[in-house]
Amino acid sequence: MTNLPAPHRLSRRSFCTLSAVALASLALPARRAFADETAAAAGDAPIVIVHTNDVHCAVDENLGYAKLVNYVDTMRSTYGADNVALVDAGDAVQGKAMGTLTNGEYLIDIMNKCGYDFAIPGNHEFDYGMTQFNTLVARAKAKYLSCNFTDLRTGNLMFDAYTMREYGTGDGKKKVAFLGICTPETLTKSSPVSFQDESGTYIYGFCEDDSGLKLYDAVQRAVDQARADGADYVVALAHLGQKGVTARWTSTSVVANTSGIDVVIDGHSHELYAQTPLNKNGQPVLVTQTGTQLVGIGQVVINPATDTITAYASDYAKTVTASTTNGTASIIETWDGIDAATAAYIVGLQAELAKITERVIGTSDVRLVALEDDDYTWAVRAHETNLGDFVADAYLALAWHGGVMADVGFVNGGGIRANIEPGDVTYGDLIDVQPYNNQLCYVDTLGQNILDLLEAGARNLPDPNGGLQQVSGLTYTVRTDIPSSVQMPGGTFGGVTGEYRVRDVMVNGEPLDVNRRYKMVSHTYLIVEGGDGLTMFKNDEAVLLDLDNKALIEYIQYDLKGTIGSEYANLAGQGRIAIKDGPDPEPTPLPQPEPEPAADPAAGPGGKPLARTGDPTGAAVVGAVAVAAAAAATGAVAVGARR
């Protein structure tokens, strides 16, 4: 048997910040201990699981699929083809032009070329509708799994909850159960209508409730059944995540409320981590995620000979490593080998689309950002950006082009998916920014609904939230020191029970009137379908406009005359959203001049008193005006301030 290579301890990527938990000890007590040394050479062959998540159509970016295939082939030649599995934890088929223009089919074809064994649906696998989702699953060679994706009409699961794979032979044979867990956020993070019948009744579900118990019970039933079927190890493929995710549905919450899972290969939140949270019996479970867009490849090794589980990388790769004397955890971030056949296959698919995607729409003098400077963390979900301003302005302009004089335009931060770099702006670039082909629409709605929309979108700040609204025609302030009291029963908006965090809302320079009706333009995902659980417009009648990426094209060509210019130069936007962690300080009154004392009448010539210099009444009036002006100026600056 081949020895496992020793892990490395190398510096992290500049864009990656691993949590303190990920840097903690990874030691596991008893039979589920991590190996701190190379696995023993004798005994059963190690079981290697290479994993990806949230690739989002990044077929040749960062590591890319061609390098992934070469890496997997190297592992198979090292440890034996039958001992290596390739799995994906969701959100592979949507996010860029290749996905949008082929409804995800080219991405499934590439995954087939890579040789994936098992996969689970992320929320974005459903973005093309349920019919197309079923087409993609049928097209895939990988087996899809889920223990909680349910047909509510029958109560049956849509996929097998788990599948069993045997490793080794004879007395050394081991069974590994691969189990799928979908995020219940799928109901609102994809298009809700995909899961409803024509009457709007939900006919599919993901074991969602307000406590998390339905999900935990579904997972536990599947784990118990897998153990009863003889599983020696249970590996969960989970599209759950942690940061910015509904707390009861995070991977750590699922681990804390279940038992019997050995490994959680996670996704959804686009984070890099390797952790060992405790399950409900106090036993540590390996939870690992590799970020997004193939910035990393994960690898888990189960060594039956020593009964250990290790998440680490091969000698052949540089690694992001969390290591102590008791354990190691790593994510592969660079790899030199490329599978030529896979690379050529991807180039061929891209060439077929190039005549569409490479059409130049205009130019940009500036960089427009959806991501922070690390090109990894979502900026548009945490604060205003110039790209958020640009997209919202384009929505509003599209309505105006159609003769609809809308007051405000909104776009959810989660719907803005890529930066625009200076230089030529192509059709493919704009599809990457808005890959969903959402239909725009407008609605006459109460100001109260607009206030509730802003409040719900800002409920997680300063943590990111895909429902944060980027705006046009409107400015607002968020006070993050005020606890959010937004109610989201079942993941949908249920009202605000306390003080609003959102305030100082101005529509075209005038305070928002909660009792007045405004014309608002956005997309059907928000207004009609209640995406992100934002259902406050369900009683308003929407009027359809054009597609979201069509709005961007028209805005560049007609309103901006072909060039995105200096008005969008500030990456932080134009001061439409102010995020504060406390109230503005009270303005300091301007110092007042002391009135001159009255003269001594005896000192005046002829015994007469001297006249006063100045008019104290007039001085007091001037001082009051100055203080009021200073207060007004301070308030104006505060509204426009950014963190």
Regions found by a protein language model. Name each.
Residues 624-643:
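C-terminal membrane-anchoring or membrane-association module
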Residues 1-10, 14, 18-28, 32-34:
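N-terminal secretory signal peptides
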Residues 30, 620-621, 638-639:
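Alpha-helical hydrophobic membrane-insertion segments
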Residues 16, 36-328, 382, 387-397, ...:
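Acidic, metal/ion-coordinating pockets
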Residues 600-624:
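Extracellular Ser/Thr-rich, low-complexity/disordered mucin-like segments
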Residues 42-48, 52, 57-58, 69, ...:
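Catalytic centers of hydrolytic enzymes
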